[in-house]
């Protein structure tokens, strides 16, 4: 992408990037769920999600610094320095910087992929990083937790069999429905600067005011991960509780006119939505723990892939014409959160009944 010159080429390459990166998130989910017990997974998934939260916080700081510090430089508004090709006299230098940036980012990704290939262990049953005794211990601790453990002698099933078992599992579809709600509501994060600017802040200050939103969310994600592992049998209720918080904030923010109050509600709502994400993934992974490894891999991939389809419609929830109240967007999020409360409360009841029987 560093060298392309047309929109069509950009779309084609972005599609390829999506194809090549499609296995990353499901792979992370499978890796974590393959090594840790059910009551150990929420904290690990929280660390995984917190990386995205931190990137949002640093992104706000960088955008604010550039927007404010570069204001008027070379005759350009500060926000224009966040983009490329907006001034003919600077086009060549900006294209060079963009090219170098993309090359560096791409090269760093490739280098880290090679490092990860040697650093990341395989499954507990066949990793060469552990001794025979350590492998037996790793498998036995998972067997004690999940009721079974897969060794090298365990019969494998085909990809078609795994897919068939996955799509026939009612547990998978409950988790897909719940995760679609969370991802769809979490597209709110795309509009943080726009929403904050609508509360009366300048464009520069709006970028910096996004940082506390992510900072509070970062803390809440960690706390939720801790309690998700401390009380693993009520993860569904923990998720439902956070969705109730976000639902309440989404409703109240539609009728509150004070800028400070709306900002505080936005912070709390964002914290609730981010906190449900990691907990929902660990809930799904632990729920699928009794499945064969191949089926669990497909099931986690389906939850991640179908759940993220919600980003398609989520990107249209806050059109410019709805500012500054954005009643449509917050109303839809409130509705999705309400449905999510029902889904995860139902999941809690059904899964506990399934375990007892």
Give, region by region, the residue ranges found by the protein language model.
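Central mid-sequence intracellular linker of multi-pass
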Residues: 38-52, 72-163, 328, 334-357
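Hydrophobic core of transmembrane alpha-helices in multi-pass small-molecule transporters
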Residues: 9-23, 31, 261-279, 283, ...
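Small-residue-rich segments within alpha-helical transmembrane domains of MFS-like 12-TM solute carriers
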Residues: 2, 6, 18-26, 35, ...
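Transmembrane alpha-helical segments of major facilitator superfamily
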Residues: 52, 209-217, 303, 307
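Hydrophobic alpha-helical segments of secondary membrane carriers
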Residues: 47-52, 178, 298-306
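Structural signature of the two symmetry-related core transmembrane helices
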Residues: 236-252
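Extracytoplasmic gate region of multi-pass secondary transporters
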Residues: 161-226, 236, 281, 312-315
């Amino acid at each position: 992408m560093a060298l392309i010159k047309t929109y069509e080429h950009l779309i084609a390459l972005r599609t390829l990037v999506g194809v090549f990166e499609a296995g990353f998130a499901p792979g992370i989910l499978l890796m974590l769920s393959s090594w840790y017990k059910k009551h150990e997974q929420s904290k690990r998934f929280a660390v995984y999600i917190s990386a995205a939260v931190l990137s949002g916080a640093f992104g706000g700081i960088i955008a604010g610094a550039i927007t404010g510090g570069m204001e008027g430089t070379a005759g350009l508004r500060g926000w224009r320095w966040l983009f490329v090709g907006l001034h003919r006299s600077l086009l060549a230098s900006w294209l060079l910087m963009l090219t170098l940036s993309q090359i560096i980012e791409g090269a760093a990704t490739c280098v880290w992929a090679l490092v990860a290939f040697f650093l990341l262990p395989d499954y507990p049953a066949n990793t060469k990083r552990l001794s025979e005794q350590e492998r037996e211990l790793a498998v036995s601790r998972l067997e004690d937790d999940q009721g079974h453990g897969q060794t090298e002698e365990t019969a494998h099933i085909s990809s078609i069999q795994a897919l068939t078992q996955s799509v026939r599992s009612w547990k998978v579809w409950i988790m897909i429905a719940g995760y679609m709600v969370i991802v769809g509501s979490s597209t709110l994060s795309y509009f943080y600067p726009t929403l904050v600017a609508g509360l009366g802040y300048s464009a520069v200050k709006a970028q910096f005011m996004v940082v506390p939103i992510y900072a509070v969310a970062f803390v809440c994600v960690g706390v939720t991960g801790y309690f998700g592992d401390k009380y693993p049998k009520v993860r569904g209720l923990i998720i439902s509780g956070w969705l109730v918080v976000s639902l309440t904030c989404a409703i109240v923010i539609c009728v509150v006119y004070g800028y400070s109050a709306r900002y505080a509600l936005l912070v709390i709502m964002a914290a609730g939505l981010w906190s449900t994400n990691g907990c929902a993934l660990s809930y799904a992974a632990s729920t699928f723990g009794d499945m064969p490894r191949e089926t669990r891999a497909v099931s986690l991939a389906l939850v991640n892939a179908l759940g993220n389809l919600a980003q398609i419609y989520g990107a249209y929830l806050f059109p410019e014409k709805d500012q500054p109240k954005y009643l449509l967007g917050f109303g839809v999020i409130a509705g999705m959160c309400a449905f999510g409360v029902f889904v995860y409360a139902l999941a809690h009841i059904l899964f506990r009944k399934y375990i007892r029987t």
